[in-house]
Amino acid sequence: MEVNTLAFIAVLLFLAVPTAFLLIPYVKTASASSGSN
């Protein structure tokens, strides 16, 4: 199966960008709550 590099990068960005937007606030709140705990 031939994988188009450009398509692979596009899918990777398409998945990574929303994931980062969700993970960054979660990690901040998680580290803040664990730090105060």
Swiss-Prot record:
Transmembrane annotation, as ranges: 7-27
InterPro entries associated with the record: PSII_PsbM, PSII_PsbM_sf
Membrane-protein topology: Single-pass membrane protein
Gene Ontology annotations of biological process type: photosynthesis, light reaction
Coiled coil: none
Keyword check for Membrane: yes
Presence of the UniProt keyword Transmembrane in the record: yes
Subcellular location: Plastid, Chloroplast thylakoid membrane
Major place of residence: plastid
GO annotations of cellular component type: chloroplast thylakoid membrane; photosystem II
Alphabetized UniProt keyword annotations: Chloroplast, Membrane, Photosynthesis, Photosystem II, Plastid, Reaction center, Thylakoid, Transmembrane, Transmembrane helix
Source superkingdom: Eukaryota
Function: One of the components of the core complex of photosystem II (PSII). PSII is a light-driven water:plastoquinone oxidoreductase that uses light energy to abstract electrons from H(2)O, generating O(2) and a proton gradient subsequently used for ATP formation. It consists of a core antenna complex that captures photons, and an electron transfer chain that converts photonic excitation into a charge separation. This subunit is found at the monomer-monomer interface.
Family: Belongs to the PsbM family.
Subunit structure and binding partners: PSII is composed of 1 copy each of membrane proteins PsbA, PsbB, PsbC, PsbD, PsbE, PsbF, PsbH, PsbI, PsbJ, PsbK, PsbL, PsbM, PsbT, PsbX, PsbY, PsbZ, Psb30/Ycf12, at least 3 peripheral proteins of the oxygen-evolving complex and a large number of cofactors. It forms dimeric complexes.
Name this polypeptide is given: Photosystem II reaction center protein M
